[in-house]
């Protein structure tokens, strides 16, 4: 998953303090002594599936993923070298990749957290999305040697992305404080959502080894009824009330105060630039 932001450096400060993330380029550990920007680490990026990170946990199609869209940030503090704006950063927790922050190339684009779903074949899944009444907004395309990405929307317009891994497998850590915990689809038609996503990700949702980390609920359960259908990324925290205090101190906003769900106690917030996400306590 990744956040599209106008100011990646501001995002670094916000999420770094909120979740304890460090940041760096693709292939860095994120714990190299200068927030991952300037260290010449030989440890690699800690990507799941890399030899340095131990055995990879197999992921079924439909698992939410962290994409591999990070480039080398401009190095700071070198006399005579013009400073380049940071266009993207990969976020790490204890040296393992957990998310990415990407600068928006067009100010008209939404400031948002995007959910990526793992798939072994992005092109085949894109065709099934079209056949199921969805839309492929951005066709599958290579992201260097990291993998293949695509952007899609379901029949109601909720946007999500696809990630076919190459050199970058996805999350190195999840389901622990400071990392991805859940993605909830807020929809106006739960039956239609069940049919669409149930067909796309049947094995991940209903197969013998299914361990889904996303679900769906009516928009009106949490938001005003006129809110468009959308996915909401949840990050795990130890204490949701304490985390809300940190969000406010860092310039973010509480959009929906804590409420109980079937998967934990959640609150919806936004960062200082308006990207919404949820804090989840279990």
Regions found by a protein language model. Name each.
Residues 1-12, 112-115, 163-195, 200-206, ...:
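N-terminal beta-strand motif that seeds the catalytic metal site of vicinal oxygen chelate
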Residues 1-7, 75-79, 88-90, 97, 103-128, 132-185, 207-218, 222-223, ...:
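Vicinal oxygen chelate
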